[in-house]
Each structure stands twice: as C-alpha cells, then as structure tokens.
Amino acid sequence: MSDPVFVAFASQKGGSGKSTLTALTASYLHYVEGVDVLVVDCDSRQYTQKDYRDHDIVVINETPALKKAFMNFYKRFDKQPYEILYATPATAIEQAEEYMKDYPAPKVVFFDITGTINDMDLVNLLAQMHYLFIPITTDTGDMKSSIRFANKVMSEMIAPGGSSIKEIKLVWNRIPSRKKSKLCELIDNYLEELQLSSLNTVLSNSARYSKDDGGMAARPTIFRSTMMPPDKQLLKDSDLPELVRELREIINV
C-alpha cells in the first residue's frame, strides 16, 4: 500500500476559510468518493474541527430527520466516520504516524494549520507536507496575508529545496460569484510573477459552506458535516465536486 499523501489547508490568520475547506474536502472525499482520509487539527488555540464534530453529533442526535438519514447512510456505507486528531504543529506528524501504526493508513491525511512562517514548529510541519492549499479571499487584509504567506513558503521553503512540498496552490474562497472576478484575474497575474498560481475552481460567498439548517428548516439539511456527505440538493452549484476533482488531479489520488 502506498504511503498517505499529506495535504494542508494553511493560513497565517483565521477567517480565510481553511477549516471549512478542510472539512468539506475531507468529507466529500471520504463519504462521497470512498477515499479513506484522516484529519489532523493543528490549531490548538481553538480546534475548529473538534467544534464541527461536536456540533454534528448534537445536531444529528437532536434532529429526527437527520438521525434517520445518518442511520440509513451508514447501512450502505462500509466505513466509519473519519478520525480527527487534535495536535500542535510540533506533535502533528508524530500523532498521525502513531495513529497509522494502529489503524489502516488512509489515502490522504489533511492538516488544518494556522500560524506564521516565523514559528519554527509550524515551518517544520509545513516542510513535511506534500501539497499546500492556501485560501485567499477578496478582502484586502486576507488577500495580502495569504499572498505573503504563500510567497514566503515558495521563496524560503520550496525554491531552496529540502522540503517535501511538491506543489502549492492558492484557493479563491468567499468571492461574490462562481466565476473569477476581474480582481481575481488581476491577482492571478500578479501571482504568476511570484511563481505562484491559484486553482481554476473558486468557491462563492455562500452560507451553505459554513453552516447547516439543522432542525430549523422544514426539510432539515446538512452541507458541511464531518460525519455525513453533503446534501445532494445543496451540492448543486456549490462547485465542491469540481474543487475536489481538481484537488485529486493535483495530489494524484
């Protein structure tokens, strides 16, 4: 069996959507496409993936329609919910390796990472990733932070060699439409000057990516879940399948 691919959604600061992207892509791969995944949450200040999992458990247990959908799904799905490990940048790799000694190795290990390039523990963790995906939004502050972070990784880690990083891509997230705007295209041109590039697929600024109806709607639905696949109706025009398809082409799984 081939070694797992280490994939990180990373940013210097919160708010760019890296945790949501981690949960969405991990869940789509695992629950829709049947690819075994492991998630390692490395942001010990808040552990967003834990919040997501805890929320999912409560919503599913307290919403009869979702509980029924959950039980029906696992009658035909021959895997368990993917595991989420909670670590620090210093311990993340060791914890993932220890887990894989006791359980079958996943195809992909997703790392949810936040921190500055000046943190040596974070630098050492990033250096062991195979692929990095950095969310970027049209907010000026977030955009500058994402570009600065990606440029530092490229110039100080990838270009000199010595890291395991094979490729780095920025991911346009929370933009006004499903197509790249003129601003996105302008920034993409600037990224080329830095030897960087973004994915072709973009995610629009839609509420479906960050929350669920839970028991509040007449027909309870769930899109971002760590325990179930996204609702099929909500998948329409979400561009999540396209994002995962492009990601799979890059990481070769």
Regions found by a protein language model. Give the residues of each.
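C-terminal boundary of histidine-terminating zinc-finger modules
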Residues: K211-P241
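P-loop/Walker-type NTP enzyme "switch/lid" segment
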Residues: A10-S16, Y31-V109
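Extreme N-terminal, non-catalytic leader segments
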Residues: M1-S11
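Active-site signature of alpha/beta-hydrolase-fold catalytic machinery across serine-
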Residues: L24-Y28
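Inter-motif core of Ras-like GTPase G domains
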Residues: M120-T140
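Beta-strand-loop-alpha "switch" segments that mediate conformational coupling across diverse proteins
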Residues: R174-F223
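Hydrophobic positions on the alpha1 helix immediately C-terminal to the Walker A/P-loop
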Residues: T20-L21
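Conserved C-terminal guanine-recognition region of P-loop GTPase G domains, centered on the G4
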Residues: S146-G162
